Amino acid sequence: MYTKKPTIPEDVIERAYRGKCTKEDALLLLEGNPFELFELANDLRASTVGDAVSYVVNRNIYITNKCVGNCGFCAYRTEKGYILSVEEILEKAGEARKAGAVEVCIQGGYIPEADIEFYLEIIESVKAEFPDLCIHALSPMEVNYAAGLSGMSVEEALHRLKKSGLDSLTGTSAEILSDRVRKIICPGKINTQQWIDTITAAHKAGISTNSTIMYGHVETLEERLDHVFIIREIQKETGGFTELIPMAFLPYNNPIGEKMIASGKFSTTGLEDLQLIAISRVILHTYVKNIQATWVKLGKKLAQVALQCGANDLGGTLMEDQISTASGGSNGEYVSPAEFEWMIKGAGRTPMQRDTLYRKVEPVIANRVEPLPGLGKTKIGSRD
């Protein structure tokens, strides 16, 4: 149990351990000594998931960089881009499998070509060729957009996606779950309630998802906290979230970031990043077991420090991350299993390779330091 409590009130600590943290408690913890918050979060982590730190050998596959959206935080979208063919997607999935991947994360933009049939063909093809690969794909926004193009309900779209072989839905397109914020940074996306409804429908259809928060732009501290509490309320109802992934906004090469920098505001500080990870652990205690410290946003060293602040997962090998790179990310696109093991052991913890659903898997090619030739290089697709 957490015992050093010189400034945190006893009732706040008691509620944290019971999974009853309030918004007022969270604000108080953030206003206090950050290292006391980190210690509390770290103890809650230990009591929930122990000392194992997980990671997944996976690959991002970006099927297109075209998008009709108008998100102000995006530096990846282009009107004249590529669309990968099914054959090219299968080639990338095959490269990933040879590198020991157990998951492919299929991502893209919103394009008129991408109706439900578009995604069904991709998912069915990948699953037929690589039945043991977990397919983690589509955001709530993509599901809504594709369902609309196909003239069907979100529920029917989710049913068909699951039947085709979709294993897990991404919890992206959440950004900040505040309609005030969304009208500024992503006015063309689904609103907060639509995101909640889509995620809830996915969980009820038997499709698990992760959850995300993209912070550090125009939102207030209270809006950040409200977002995490919304995640908690959904989890109380469905139990379908596997994790929370806090993702700091990268304010480079995009309109929102340009305005921020012009006003003298830059990316989040390391302390701010660690505080959000820690307070997320406190708020979500007993509900969402896994909190990820994403190395591609935080950098490897800060991600390692986050393991002492409530995080218990380092994310995936990725093999490519075009979205972060386009927004000025400088932490690379690939971490080998061997380096993950090194980082985790260096933090005094026990490494554990996992799959998308946080099930332990036997280490595959754990000593591979470099990706296979061709990984991280996106070919221009022919499907347009």
UniProtKB/Swiss-Prot annotation:
[4Fe-4S] cluster binds at residues 67, 71, 74. PROSITE patterns: RADICAL_SAM. It comes from the Archaea. Keywords: 4Fe-4S, Iron, Iron-sulfur, Metal-binding, S-adenosyl-L-methionine, Transferase. Pathway: Cofactor biosynthesis; coenzyme F0 biosynthesis. Its cofactor is [4Fe-4S] cluster. It holds the Pfam family Radical_SAM. CDD domains: Radical_SAM. SUPFAM superfamilies: Radical SAM enzymes (SSF102114). One of its GO terms (molecular function) is 7,8-didemethyl-8-hydroxy-5-deazariboflavin synthase activity. Its EC number is 2.5.1.147. Binds 1 [4Fe-4S] cluster. The cluster is coordinated with 3 cysteines and an exchangeable S-adenosyl-L-methionine. Residues 53-286 form the Radical SAM core domain. It catalyses: 5-amino-6-(D-ribitylamino)uracil + L-tyrosine + S-adenosyl-L-methionine = 5-amino-5-(4-hydroxybenzyl)-6-(D-ribitylimino)-5,6-dihydrouracil + 2-iminoacetate + 5'-deoxyadenosine + L-methionine + H(+). The keyword Transferase applies. InterPro entries: Aldolase_TIM, CofH/MnqC-like_C, CofH_family, Elp3/MiaA/NifB-like_rSAM, F420, FO_synthase_su2, rSAM. Consists of two subunits, CofG and CofH. Belongs to the radical SAM superfamily. CofH family. Catalyzes the radical-mediated synthesis of 5-amino-5-(4-hydroxybenzyl)-6-(D-ribitylimino)-5,6-dihydrouracil from 5-amino-6-(D-ribitylamino)uracil and L-tyrosine. PANTHER family: FO SYNTHASE (COFH), LIPOYL SYNTHASE 2. This is 5-amino-6-(D-ribitylamino)uracil--L-tyrosine 4-hydroxyphenyl transferase 2. It comes from Methanosarcina barkeri (strain Fusaro / DSM 804).
